[in-house]
A protein has these predicted regions:
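Bacterial Sec-dependent N-terminal signal peptides
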Residues: 1-13
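N-terminal accessory beta-strand-rich subdomains and adjacent acidic, glycine-rich linkers
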Residues: 14-243
Length: 243
């Protein structure tokens, strides 16, 4: 039996918002890392930024579900890598447009319109695939990681997310320290480059506060560019999340 896997060239994949103002460019760089950038009306909003995940390394003192010894540390290091070594296997685009009515809120009807790009990435060194799905709306970009059912990626724990958002400028940011337990902080307004130096004084002596990083901030993070564009970074579709 022969296994035949074909790949499309690692050329740039472009996606445009329905109104044409936002343009996403995706490609796999020379290290095999998924990379994207975003422009708005021809101006760079997000510079080339890499995507990926790091998995928790398996315990090398145990056997796997097939009772195979897992003492090859090099292989275990490789299996924790979901951030480079990829090839672009396929790219699919779709469009979607619907109007729905919320139960309450300021709008009677909300239009859900976007163009979508799904990139299927194959990692030869671990014989596994992931999907990165982008949705580009007239007012923003969303993306998520998907894990097709496969033997080589059956059970795993995500240790770190390595999604990058490389801002195109030293924007004004409206931020609070990143915290596991609370949102009860006063907002600080500063340039992005000043966050590290201001973090200590942004944390108040409060037993409910548990900052997770000396530099990390909480989402939603709102920013304002020098030419008046507002940018907001946040999470979406937290389905079944323990909050």
């Amino acid at each position: 039996a022969f296994l035949c896997i074909s790949f499309i060239a690692n050329a740039q994949q472009k996606l445009t918002s329905p109104d044409g103002n936002l343009v996403l460019t995706f490609q796999v760089n020379k290290e095999g890392a998924p990379t994207y950038d975003l422009t708005y009306k021809g101006k760079v909003v997000i510079k080339p930024s890499t995507l990926g995940l790091e998995l928790k390394k398996e315990d090398n003192t145990r056997t796997d579900f097939d009772w195979v010894d897992r003492r090859d540390l090099t292989k275990l290091d490789s299996k924790s890598n979901l951030y480079n070594g990829f090839k672009l296997k396929d790219a699919q685009t779709t469009t979607f447009d619907e109007t729905w009515q919320p139960v309450w809120g300021e709008e009677k009807e909300i239009r859900n319109q976007y163009n979508e790009l799904a990139v299927i990435l194959f990692q030869p060194m671990n014989d596994r695939s992931i999907v990165v799905r982008f949705r580009l709306f007239n007012d923003g970009l969303g993306f998520r990681y998907e894990f097709p059912q496969q033997k080589s990626l059956n059970y795993f724990v995500i240790k770190e997310e390595h999604s990058q958002f490389a801002m195109a400028g030293n924007h004004i940011a409206y931020w609070i320290p990143g915290d596991y337990d609370t949102q009860e902080y006063d907002y600080t307004i500063s340039r992005l480059s000043e966050i590290r130096g201001l973090m200590q004084q942004a944390i108040t002596p409060n037993s409910s506060q548990t900052p997770f990083s000396p530099t990390g901030v909480q989402t939603a993070l709102m920013m304002k560019t020098d030419d008046g564009l507002y940018i907001n970074l946040h999470e979406a579709a937290l389905i079944d999340y323990s909050c």
